[in-house]
Amino acid sequence: MSATVSLLFGVHAHQPAGNFASVVDEAHEKSYGPYLRTVYRYPQFRFSVHFSGWLLDYLLVHYPDDMALLREMVARGQAELFGGGDMEPVLASIPYRDRVGQITALSDRLERAFGRRPRGAWLTERVWEATVVPALADSGIEFVTVDDYHFVCAGQPLDALTGHFTTEEDDRRLDLFPISEQLRYRIPFAPADETVRYLESLATPGRAVAAIYFDDIEKFGIWPETYDWVYGKRWLEQFIEGVLASPVITPAHFETERAAAPTRGIVYLPTTSYLEMGEWSLPAAKADDYAALVAHHKDHGTYDRFKPFLRGGIWRNFLSRYPEANWMHKRMLGLSARVAALPQAQRTDEMLDLLYRSQANDAYWHGLFGGLYLPHLRRAVWNAAIALEHLLDAVDARAPAEARDVDHDGWTEILLHDAEVQAVVRDDADAALVEFASYALAHNFGDTLTRRREHYYRHMDAQEQSQAQHGGIASAHDRVAFRHAIGPAD
């Protein structure tokens, strides 16, 4: 058996519901459109793609020509569609019923638009908890991608992560593909020819090897310097041409690779996400300590050895770090329960759409990008939640005054409402007004955010980092840039 390597190459495209049209249009102009038009010219370059539901709808309406190219690539067997949660929720953070509903909604949307129902799914922010397995399996999903870091944390050796594994929860089976961290940091930042040579180096005589990549499509045009690098300087074309010219590399789909090779075995992954999330989800002081610990081991050459044990926080930590995010989340859970309790005849598609929009992950956390700190993203969640509550009250009236601990923080909240507004007061020493919602405007006037120290403040004295290794460009993870010099007034 000659030495070969299967390249499983996937890209993920997402914009949060409520994002500015100008932002989405720029993303399409610089990333989604050029990417699709480039890969279209290479029918033999098989790739996988995931679009979140709100973004997919936007592109189908505003950019039908580029979506027609994708439809043709799906039909000719070049593009493999991935599903997932329709409005890009962190599946672990929503109830089972909504996990199934969201996954099914996106699968339905893809089938209507492209004539194919996905068998693989993108896991939002690669947040893994074993509890998501039953909903994925029950929704017709057979495999997902997560980071190789997840497997390393489970004790798997890195050199074994060149194929798919199998897990189960409550006797529901799901196959797992480990995304290569090495490829995530090389593509598209290292020179194309160097990346192709790296892929070729993975080929092993007598052994089936898959090189697995699945990451944000925004790295191909939206991240700093990438538009000129990927399209102006032809990185993507050079990479594809190098892959297709290689006698060693075969572009493949996840589904066909899974059918061609047996599972590498059973695995049970710990609750985790990608490596960077472990730092971002910690409180600022602890994130500083964690970063220092990682730096110490890297400086002393022991990082790879101890990496499985150098885990930080988990995604849910954001809900304990930010009471504002926790309040949104627990209000959303309450609305989900009310929708589920309705008789089927009273439960409408509009209610489900608003519920799913309120579960969009972006406004509940933040890392490299603004997330929770962007008021228009929080506003979109609140708009959906308040509009949904208004619809629910019309068919399932509530008492005008209620007292309960909505957000599970140990304090009772008093909810006072009529047909026009709702005021929520916390029954503590401050009697703080934690929500003031207008149903006519579908707006929460109490949607504010307390200023807090963040872990990245430690970089304030750093200079902009734009120097890359190996003649490529720097990843956004390696950059520190300011709109203006930081001074005392800031």
PLM regions and their residue ranges:
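Gly/Pro-rich turn-and-neighbor structural signature
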Residues: 97, 112, 117, 122-167, ...
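Positively charged, amphipathic and often flexible ligand-engagement surfaces
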Residues: 90, 146-161, 176-190, 194-198
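CE4/NodB-like, metal-dependent polysaccharide N-deacetylase domain
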Residues: 98-125, 200-217
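Short, well-structured secondary-structure segments
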Residues: 4-96, 101-102, 117-123, 142-148, ...
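Active-site and substrate-binding clefts of carbohydrate-active enzymes
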Residues: 2-33, 40-42, 161-166, 170-174, ...
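Generic structural signal for well-ordered alpha-helices
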Residues: 32-39, 67-71, 100-110, 133, ...
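Alpha-helical scaffolding within the catalytic cores
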Residues: 33-35, 61-76, 155-169, 193-202
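Acidic-aromatic substrate-binding/catalytic surfaces of carbohydrate-active enzymes
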Residues: 26-29, 97, 101-104, 422-490
